[in-house]
A protein has these predicted regions:
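FIC/Doc superfamily catalytic core
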Residues: 1-188
Length: 188
């Protein structure tokens, strides 16, 4: 599909990409997270906390770390399960194909295990985002979700070798959020 998804690369974007790639190169030069497993672990915990906080998880960073370490935490059962699920998803991430719709569903199933009745399945109903009582976004109709996701993944596969990975992942994320393929957990 020509001009899908719709995006334009600006000079400002290219400057950001250049700066980020330079930082990644510097980080890789020093062997980054592989050389420092404790840094990798702490980064993962912070990432889990931040990602879940966006989804209204109320656990603090310290509580998230305690859950991951197997300690008892006082908090909502759902919040605790979200942390366990996110950690499990991180553990499995190297086993999945980033260009597979089915693997995306598998990871979603892990992320929403024991939380959502339709874990790992595309939504089968309308979806909207609200700010209080005000509808601020309406997702595409559920019947279009499988085709939209196939189009998005096909675009990624076709462009993975000729679009910078930062741009590819950013466009993917934008379109993913627009499609809102799952009932819950789209932000994780």
């Amino acid at each position: 599909m020509e001009n899908y998804p719709p995006y334009m690369i600006t000079d400002k974007m290219l400057n950001y990409v250049s700066d980020i790639m330079k930082k990644i190169g510097e980080f890789n030069y020093f062997e980054g997270l592989n050389r420092y497993p404790e840094l990798r672990r702490k980064t993962r915990i912070k990432s889990i906390h931040s990602s879940l906080a966006i989804e209204n998880n109320q656990l603090s960073l310290f509580q998230v770390e305690d859950v991951i370490n197997g300690k008892m935490v006082i908090g909502e059962k759902k919040d605790i399960q979200e942390v366990k699920n996110a950690y499990e998803a991180y553990e499995k991430i190297d086993e999945v194909n980033p260009y597979s719709v089915n693997d995306l569903k598998k990871i979603h199933g892990i992320l929403t295990f024991l939380i959502e009745k339709d874990a790992g399945k595309f939504r089968n109903h309308g979806e909207a985002v609200y700010d209080g009582n005000i509808k601020i976004f309406v997702a595409p109709p559920h019947r279009l979700v499988p085709k939209l996701m196939d189009n998005l993944f096909n675009w990624m596969i076709e462009n993975k070798d000729n679009v910078n990975p930062l741009i590819l992942s950013s466009v993917f994320h934008y379109e993913f959020v627009f499609i809102h393929p799952f009932s819950d957990g789209n932000g994780r």
